[in-house]
Amino acid sequence: MDIIGGQHLRQMWDDLADVYGHKTALICESSGGVVNRYSYLELNQEINRTANLFYTLGIRKGDKVALHLDNCPEFIFCWFGLAKIGAIMVPINARLLCEESAWILQNSQACLLVTSAQFYPMYQQIQQEDATQLRHICLTDVALPADDGVSSFTQLKNQQPATLCYAPPLSTDDTAEILFTSGTTSRPKGVVITHYNLRFAGYYSAWQCALRDDDVYLTVMPAFHIDCQCTAAMAAFSAGATFVLVEKYSARAFWGQVQKYRATVTECIPMMIRTLMVQPPSANDQQHRLREVMFYLNLSEQEKDAFCERFGVRLLTSYGMTETIVGIIGDRPGDKRRWPSIGRVGFCYEAEIRDDHNRPLPAGEIGEICIKGIPGKTIFKEYFLNPQATAKVLEADGWLHTGDTGYRDEEDFFYFVDRRCNMIKRGGENVSCVELENIIAAHPKIQDIVVVGIKDSIRDEAIKAFVVLNEGETLSEEEFFRFCEQNMAKFKVPSYLEIRKDLPRNCSGKIIRKNLK
């Protein structure tokens, strides 16, 4: 069955402009408080102008164009402008530094870059090293350096007509994007995402939170990340809703933004929930229109209950990864929710728990979470120019090995245990980092926590805890270890404690454990 009706992204935007016209499609708020609004008609015109800009710079179907941008309207223009002419977007994590960004440019074969002035010096250095195919840079800022091969994105775009000049034949199987994984354990891999993937993601994610055209979906997730693109933006646009894109997350500003824009759906990660909870309570905390808060792993039950009670919201759990495109397991619309379950498998997918020999396990037994989808349609197509890595995780019949451990119950609710690489082997016992982190996070003085395994000559691995304290708090080792001993089995109690000001995170808020080992 063809869920998307054979419609690629160019057709999608032309239809949206016709159907929704002057209805608000996109609101962008910068960190400085500047707000830009676009109707569906205006946004389609900006997308067309951007597509024409790329065409005048020599970009054709199949060419790769990198974006190194924070959340901004230009990201949306470029994303869909490239798709309209069959070119391929390569978003770069805005937190990456020179060597990491150069590596993605090299391995994606990007020939053009759109970025802002704050990142330009880094790319000057990359160009001088002459190790990439990059031949031109467009800067979104008005002020331009006097360099060859650099253009003003805004000036060039505004010179273009609002109708599309170049419209090559497109297929839903065409690649729309190469999205490099966050690489918390190794070098990033380029996840190939098709037009079909993005169109399907829109319909699926809109179904998951029952989006309507009168909804307002607000996110602070980075636009270069799969959550923002496929769970938020594609869902909102596919439903004809209003999409609110905030440049960066601020714990002090976020709830006010939810209220100001009358958001009905938003999404949170644990870091956001924890930092919101340490903000001063307000009598207005429950004065909002939120129907759903999309939530991604992992939170203790105490933290969940406290957040929901204070803000008067409910969490809609969703589990997925870049390779699955969407939250393939999650709470279903109208279905019961069973915390701490991550929900049930969504439509168009199958899910199993498998053992180390790739055999399905019965309910209650822990193994690897495996997902069956259709490559290039409901799950990613492949890793770019990396068939060995693709074959390692994706079977010929569409079964994807997630690398996550979990189990299911008799009613097919699934439960996440941990990343396989986050299991600590301690004296013959397997210890889940997430389990320990959820227990330790309940300590009233602790704001953030991560545990890792470090080498131990006697017991394979020892457990070390890194904690960030709430402002003004102090915590002795004696108090910390006593709390652990009272709340977990003896073999799970950490051997070491380190108190830090912050923890290293990637763009999606996940802690980069390898930086702590």
From Swiss-Prot:
Catalytic activities: 4-(trimethylamino)butanoate + ATP + CoA = 4-(trimethylamino)butanoyl-CoA + AMP + diphosphate; crotonobetaine + ATP + CoA = crotonobetainyl-CoA + AMP + diphosphate; (R)-carnitine + ATP + CoA = (R)-carnitinyl-CoA + AMP + diphosphate
Effect of residue 345 to A: In strain: O44:K74 and B
Biological or metabolic pathway of the protein: Amine and polyamine metabolism; carnitine metabolism
Molecular function per GO: acid-thiol ligase activity; carnitine-CoA ligase activity; crotonobetaine-CoA ligase activity
Domain of life, source organism: Bacteria
Family matches, as CDD domains: FACL_DitJ_like
Matches recorded under Gene3D superfamilies: 3.30.300.30, N-terminal domain of ligase-like (3.40.50.12780)
Entry keyword annotation includes Ligase: yes
Coiled-coil residue windows: none
Annotated effect of mutating residue 328 to S: In strain: O44:K74
Role summary: Catalyzes the transfer of CoA to carnitine, generating the initial carnitinyl-CoA needed for the CaiB reaction cycle. Also has activity toward crotonobetaine and gamma-butyrobetaine.
Protein name: Crotonobetaine/carnitine--CoA ligase
Annotated organism of origin: Escherichia coli (strain K12)
Gene name tied to this protein: caiC
